[in-house]
A protein has these predicted regions:
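Metal-dependent nuclease catalytic regions and adjoining charged, substrate-binding loops involved
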Residues: 213, 228-232, 243-342
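Conserved catalytic cores of phosphodiester-cleaving nucleases, focusing on short active-site segments
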Residues: 68-69, 176-225, 241
Length: 342
């Protein structure tokens, strides 16, 4: 069975939504939402508006990762899904395919330099990562070459996919965007198509960690090695992509840093076997189903009452090592007031 429900713009248009979703103006889940605890998820996706979320500050790691993905995709992709003038996702022919790699890297590096650092530490990262982007990109090209991506057709990037209730049993769709899908061309009765790719690739970049201040006042940095095993959250993301194609397409998870690349697949990672992917997809659905049940208990109330009653049942985990970082002091105070801790 091929799970093809091409999502171009808004999951809201895919099917009827439950009452709580309509009242709270939510229409989908995503692997990113899985990766944060319930309390942080509730605040970011039910309290903050989409505009407020988009206004949250980025950091140098995120911007550098975007730069690397852009370089790899612009050089290799046949098609890149992008938002058009009316905020509608559309597959567009890549006009920069096979353009000189170094030229693309220089252009993306210049765009990265436009990032406005959040603080002194982020500024130090910004300066450091400018020196690392070239190496990370080159390792990315090497990894993709090893997988034979460059010689396959078609290569599609940033395709938005949606898993609906028929597959997940959730009220809301689960939405994601693939870094790369490649291959799978078929010819039938003279018509060439690629209904199912030959492979799915998810790329994760790693950047040197900030160390202690030197006597000179400069920041020291610690180089990272590729992980011995993938991040659980990254495997969840891969499982979502695999489920979309009914686990018929192999998934490759690539880690890149300035020193090396590492490719995980079903041969060296249990989480990327069919059984592992199915298990992780089930785990993701379980988390989202819990959140739906929490909200549905109060769906006959008004939106603010739904939020307040749900908050009373959730630990905000303000001590979490990263999920409340970068949310801004004003929003953090707002969240703590919501949970009555200040």
């Amino acid at each position: 069975m091929l799970l093809k429900n091409n999502l171009l713009e808004d999951p809201l248009k895919e099917k009827a939504l439950p009452l709580f979703a309509k009242k709270l103006n939510i229409n989908h889940f995503s692997p990113t939402q899985f990766s944060i605890p319930d309390g942080n998820w509730l605040f970011k996706y039910l309290v903050l508006t989409q505009e407020e979320r988009r206004a949250l500050p980025s950091n140098s790691q995120m911007k550098a990762g975007v730069a690397v993905n852009n370089v790899l995709q612009k050089h290799l992709a046949d098609t890149i899904w992008k938002f058009g003038p009316q905020r509608k996702l559309t597959p567009m022919a890549n006009q920069e395919k096979n353009k000189d790699k170094q030229e693309i890297i220089h252009a993306e590096l210049q765009e990265f330099r436009n990032h406005i650092a959040n603080d002194d530490k982020d500024q130090a990262k910004k300066e450091k990562y400018q020196d690392e982007i070239f190496a990370v990109c080159n390792h990315g090209f090497s990894a993709l070459e090893k997988l034979g991506v460059a010689t396959t057709y078609p290569i599609t990037c940033e395709e938005q996919i949606s898993i609906t209730q028929e597959v997940s049993s959730l009220f809301l769709s689960v939405v994601g965007r693939t870094d790369f899908t490649f291959g799978g061309v078929q010819e039938k009765e003279g018509v060439i198509s690629a209904p199912t790719p030959a492979g799915i690739i998810e790329i994760k970049t790693q950047w040197s960690k900030v160390g202690k201040l030197k006597k000179s006042g400069e920041r020291s940095f610690i180089s990272l090695s590729a992980p011995a095993t993938p991040s659980y959250n990254h495997l969840i993301q891969c499982a979502m992509y695999a489920a979309y194609w009914n686990y018929e397409v192999p998934v490759y998870l690539i880690y890149l840093n300035k020193n090396e690349y590492k490719i995980f697949d079903s041969s060296n990672c249990e989480g990327l076997t069919i059984e592992g992917l199915q298990k992780n997809f089930k785990n993701m659905v379980t988390v989202f189903k819990r959140r739906e049940k929490l909200l549905s208990q109060y769906e006959n109330l008004d939106p603010q009452q739904i939020i307040e009653n749900t908050v009373a049942m959730i630990d905000p985990m303000f001590e979490h090592p990263y999920c409340w970082h970068g949310i801004g002091e004003e929003n953090l105070i707002k969240a703590k007031k919501l949970w009555n801790v200040i």
